[in-house]
Structure formats: C-alpha cells, structure tokens
From Swiss-Prot:
An annotated GO cellular component: cytosol
Official protein name in the record: Thymidylate kinase
Enzyme class: transferase
Gene Ontology molecular function: any one: ATP binding
Organism classification: Bacteria, Pseudomonadati, Thermodesulfobacteriota, Desulfuromonadia, Geobacterales
Coiled coil: none
Length: 225
C-alpha cells in the first residue's frame, strides 16, 4: 500500500503551495506521487465542487453543503485515492475529512457525530497517515485569499472567502482542536511567513515525523527545490 498525506488549513494559509512543493521534492527523489484535492479530484466530484464553491450559490443550506461534500468524497475516494494507494503511490490531498469537521462542524455548527458518521461512510474508513496543518491568523489568511481573488479578476470559487471573520476563526479553532485530539497524525506548521520560510518548517516537521513512522524515502525531502 502507498502512503496518504493530507494538507489542511484555513483560506489563504498556503497549504496548496506547500503541497505542490512537496510533490516536486518527492518526484525528484523518484517517488510515485498522486496529487489530488477536495472537493473535487475526479470529474463527478469536480461538478459538485463547482456548486459548493461558486459564490453565486449562497443559498446552499449547511446540511445540503455537508451532504454534497460527503457525496463528492465518496466518489473521489473510490475513483482516485484508493486506486493510487493500491498502486503503492504517495497520495497528497489538498483537504480531506478534517476540513468537513472544521468547516461544517465548527464553522457551521452541525452535529460532529453526524459528520463523523458521514465521513466514515464516504471514505470506507480510508484515513491519512499524516496530516499537515498549515496554521496562520485568520486576518493573514483572508488577506492573502482576497488578494489572490483580485489578482485572478474575481475567481468564481470564493464562496467561503466571503464568510465572516468569526466563521473563519471558528474553522481555525476547529482545526487546532483536531490537531490536539490526534497528535499522532497531525503536524502543525506556522504558515504566517513567506513561502520559503513555511517550506523550511514543513520540511523539518515532515523529516521528524517520517523518521518516527519509519518512512525512509520521505525523510530525505528538502525545501527550496
């Protein structure tokens, strides 16, 4: 079986950039890597992503939002993640089940036990071996996210960026609560700095954790590639 790593964090934390950099390092080391994301990652789930993230769809209720995420995840896990792991690849996923707990659970206030049941049903109990949480203050993350939207002439995928500071603080608190509850799976990295600074922190955190897990190849990752 392969090795499953997820990247999590609030809007604008820099997780997508750090995931891409890690992929480049691993490929340079000869690792077979599948990079994917949620919501989305395959054609059916990408259609649900378009609905979930389009700012025009502000009328989506919290429950409908939760169920759409679960449906997209069920398709994604079976079509992309499980086959890649069975091929022995390292899977890097931009958001996974923890995002649903943080956003729909802590952010929207939905029942965490219901979310846990849906996540289990959607994933078939597939879980990441390691989750990298890129953490930064809400104000920093949203400033970056809004700057990115302006730079792309108003991207459509901005429904969550339009939520209140309080919502995003609840999401951040939810992520930190998850990291505290599952320290054997999470590594928390300060994402307040620039890309290079955060990359160095990710590199060191991964090296320490991979050594403890006995994953030899991943202990060789170097930042700045």
């Amino acid at each position: 079986m392969g090795f499953f790593i997820t990247f999590e964090g609030i809007e604008g934390c820099g997780k997508t950039t750090q995931l891409r950099l890690l992929k480049e390092r691993l490929v340079a080391l000869g690792e077979k890597v599948t990079v994917t994301r949620e919501p989305g990652g395959c054609p059916v789930a990408d259609q649900m992503r378009a609905i979930l993230l389009d700012a025009k769809n502000s009328a989506i209720t919290p429950l409908a939002e939760l169920l759409l995420y679960a449906a997209a995840r069920a398709q994604h896990v079976q079509e992309v993640i499980v086959p890649a792991l069975e091929r022995g690849e390292t899977v890097l996923c931009d958001r996974f089940t923890d995002a649903t707990v943080a956003y729909q659970g802590h952010g929207r206030g939905l029942d965490l036990s219901v979310i846990e049941e849906l996540n289990t049903l959607a994933t078939g109990r597939v879980q990441p071996a390691l989750t990298v949480l890129i953490d930064c203050p809400v104000e920093v993350g949203l400033s970056r996210a809004l700057a990115r939207i302006e730079a792309t002439s108003g991207a459509k995928e901005e429904r969550f960026e339009r939520e209140s500071l309080l919502f995003h603080q609840k999401v951040r608190d939810g992520y930190l609560a998850l990291a505290a509850a599952f320290p054997e799976r999470f590594v928390v990295v300060d994402g307040s700095g620039d890309v290079q600074q955060t990359g160095l922190l990710v590199e060191e955190a991964l090296r320490r954790r991979m050594q403890s897990l006995g994953k030899a190849g991943l202990t060789e990752v170097k930042a700045g590639c």
